[in-house]
């Protein structure tokens, strides 16, 4: 489509013109989001060898992509928060002066789209027209980005109609950083070398510039860049929350519904929890979102959440009919797979899919693979991009423009000791304290000499806060003052990953986590037995329904205990963590820590 048919928004038209003059694409194409457009772009990529169609009998409407081996994940050390002052970026973000960064990037962007098309993608984060939604426009030279954005967000003409002539949008500029000379064709996946990759955010201007990567969160700018980094700044300024959280709906046997959000660092089973199949009779979990929640107070003083996305961008390896059957059903059709293995009959395969490796595969790098190869057939960060509407347990109100009222916020991480299976905060501020100290023990999976140490990840937002982490934690504290305390969600810290002294899991996890959710639902409804401990309210040993579960009473006691010695060590570790955030850390959090230490010292278990 041409621009004049699509929009009369002067700010948008001027910006597209200015960016095109800098990037010099061969042509500009405005995306309308139609099926016909999608098929045309897919065909373009199949013809160029970038996309492999999968077997239509096994995976209808599905395609496999292989990226360059240097372009396989988010690049945190090339991700910048270019606020006007370094102080605003804070101690946990990479900062470059915005004037300097723009000058550097303008040099890179000059002529970077030669030989390519500039695609204009108008997109809505959240249902089009929702009072909680926001509009962005991404300019990209990657058709791969267009077909993924079409799944992950709502794109096209309807978004421009909503934007109108003077609506506001977040400008997102993206280039793979690989201009083509006349007559030159791509040899595989286009991207720039690591030192030329920049994923840059200008928070005051609400602008995103990304260069040099075609992959995932670096290139699909609606996801982490907008929905978390820029949106977190908007949320701070406008009095709401943009969070790295799943959203689910739990229905009890009587038909009562409770809505819950949950923040977990990577590799803690967020998507699995969002699509949980409960093992306790009569209970049902349905998905509203698996990754991001935008939350605002409603007229009734309760916190309402929407999922700003329209799809799932999930890690494929480890996803199986055992770990997440609902995800497996979601990705049966109309799904884009990236960096997983291809079977000889045109299906996908990855480690942890639950079936034996076939005798022969084409691996994620396009090479022949056999079980004797000694390498992984799929990249550990191999992905699927699938429409949320295909999830068999998508909740009926997942696109409700008003959002859903949140009764409980879960936080968690992977901790083999110290943190119990579940405990509830005393109040909102104590819950924010728990969120500020959460994290996972560093495992051998991360290349690090810190194995056994805890990587603290406040509210699982460490890589995604668009401003100073201390101001972010203060913003959470401030949110608690904006409504009647009785209307605030209750905050629960869960840990599915406890081990005994022999390194054996104490809790079976997966669907059995519904037993913990049941207690949480009982607690928010004024029921559910609990005992007050130094760290918060803990279920009594008989409060968790263990009917039909092979977990001994001793193990349950271990899972629901406060180990004074381990917790006093934890306090020392938190002190070091807090010191690393510097002088600006909210005084309330230091006060919470001191109070915890005092309660522990007086505790006799």
Curated annotation (Swiss-Prot):
Enzyme class: lyase
Binding site for GTP: 267-272, 383, 414, 510-513
Enzyme Commission number, as recorded: 4.1.1.32
GO cellular component, one term: cytosol
One GO molecular-function entry: manganese ion binding
Main location class: cytoplasm
Ligand binding (Mn(2+)): 224, 244, 291
Keyword GTP-binding: yes
PROSITE patterns: PEPCK_GTP
Location(s) in or outside the cell: Cytoplasm
InterPro entries cross-referenced by the UniProt entry: PEP_carboxykin_GTP_CS, PEP_carboxykinase_C, PEP_carboxykinase_GTP, PEP_carboxykinase_GTP_C, PEP_carboxykinase_GTP_N, PEP_carboxykinase_N
Residues binding substrate: 74, 215-217, 266, 381-383
Substrates-to-products reaction catalysed: oxaloacetate + GTP = phosphoenolpyruvate + GDP + CO2
Pfam families named among the record's database cross-references: PEPCK_GTP, PEPCK_N
Co-factor: note: Binds 1 Mn(2+) ion per subunit.
Enzyme active site: 268
Swiss-Prot/TrEMBL cofactor(s): Mn(2+)
GO biological process, one term: glycerol biosynthetic process from pyruvate
Protein origin, superkingdom: Bacteria
Function: Catalyzes the conversion of oxaloacetate (OAA) to phosphoenolpyruvate (PEP), the rate-limiting step in the metabolic pathway that produces glucose from lactate and other precursors derived from the citric acid cycle.
Stored HAMAP family: PEPCK_GTP
Protein name in UniProt: Phosphoenolpyruvate carboxykinase [GTP]
Organism: Acetivibrio thermocellus (strain ATCC 27405 / DSM 1237 / JCM 9322 / NBRC 103400 / NCIMB 10682 / NRRL B-4536 / VPI 7372)
């Amino acid at each position: 489509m041409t621009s004049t048919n699509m929009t009369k928004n002067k700010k948008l038209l001027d910006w597209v013109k200015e960016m095109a003059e800098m990037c010099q694409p061969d042509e500009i194409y405005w995306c309308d989001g139609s099926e016909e457009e999608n098929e045309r772009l897919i065909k373009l990529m199949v013809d160029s060898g970038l996309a492999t169609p999968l077997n239509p009998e096994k995976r209808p409407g599905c395609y496999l992509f292989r990226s360059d081996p240097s372009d396989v994940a988010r690049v945190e050390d090339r991700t910048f928060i270019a606020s006007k002052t370094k102080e605003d970026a804070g101690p946990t973000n990479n900062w470059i002066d915005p004037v300097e960064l723009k000058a550097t990037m303008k040099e890179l962007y000059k002529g970077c789209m030669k030989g390519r098309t500039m695609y204009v993608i108008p997109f809505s984060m959240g249902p089009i027209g929702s009072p909680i939604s926001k509009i962005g426009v991404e300019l990209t030279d990657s058709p791969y980005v267009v077909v993924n954005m079409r799944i992950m967000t709502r794109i096209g003409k309807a978004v421009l109609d909503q934007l109108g002539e003077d609506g506001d949008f977040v400008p997102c500029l993206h280039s793979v950083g690989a201009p083509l000379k006349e007559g030159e064709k791509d040899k595989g996946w286009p991207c720039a070398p690591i030192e030329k990759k920049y994923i840059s955010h200008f928070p005051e201007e609400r602008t995103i510039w990304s260069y040099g990567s075609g992959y995932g969160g670096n290139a699909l700018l609606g996801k982490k860049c907008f929905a978390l980094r820029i949106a977190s700044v908007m949320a701070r300024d406008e009095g709401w929350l943009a969070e790295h959280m799943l959203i689910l709906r739990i229905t009890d046997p009587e038909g009562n519904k409770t809505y819950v959000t949950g923040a977990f660092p990577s590799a803690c089973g967020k998507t699995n929890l969002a699509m949980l199949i409960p093992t306790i009779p009569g209970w049902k979990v349905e998905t509203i979102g698996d990754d991001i929640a935008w939350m605002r107070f409603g007229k009734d003083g309760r916190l309402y959440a929407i999922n700003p996305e329209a799809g799932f961008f999930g890690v494929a390896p480890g996803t199986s009919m055992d770990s997440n059957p609902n995800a497996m059903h979601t990705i049966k059709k109309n799904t884009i797979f990236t960096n997983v293995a291809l079977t000889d009959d045109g299906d996908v395969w990855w480690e942890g899919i639950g079936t034996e490796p076939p005798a022969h595969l084409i691996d994620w790098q396009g090479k022949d693979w056999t079980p004797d190869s000694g390498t992984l057939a799929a990249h550990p960060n191999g992905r699927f991009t699938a429409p949320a509407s295909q999830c068999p347990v998508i909740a009926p109100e997942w696109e409700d423009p008003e959002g859903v009222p949140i009764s409980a916020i879960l936080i968690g991480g992977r901790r083999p000791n110290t943190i119990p299976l579940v405990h509830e905060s005393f109040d909102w501020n104590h819950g924010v304290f728990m969120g500020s100290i959460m994290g996972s023990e560093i495992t051998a999976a991360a290349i690090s000499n810190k194995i056994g140490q805890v990587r603290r990840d406040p509210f699982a937002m460490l890589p995604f806060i668009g401003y100073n982490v201390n101001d972010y934690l203060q913003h959470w504290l401030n949110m608690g003052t904006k409504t009647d305390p009785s209307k605030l969600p209750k905050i629960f810290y869960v840990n599915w990953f406890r081990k005994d002294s022999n390194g054996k899991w104490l809790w079976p996890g997966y669907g059995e986590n519904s037993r913990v959710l049941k207690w949480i639902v009982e607690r928010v409804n004024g029921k559910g037995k609990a005992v007050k401990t130094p760290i918060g309210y803990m279920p009594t040993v008989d409060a968790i329904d263990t009917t039909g579960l092979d977990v001994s009473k001793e193990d349950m006691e271990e899972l629901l205990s406060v180990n004074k010695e381990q917790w006093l060590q934890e306090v020392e570790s938190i002190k070091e963590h807090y010191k690393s955030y510097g002088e600006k850390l909210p005084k309330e959090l230091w006060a919470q820590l001191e109070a915890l230490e005092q309660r522990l010292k007086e505790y006799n278990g």
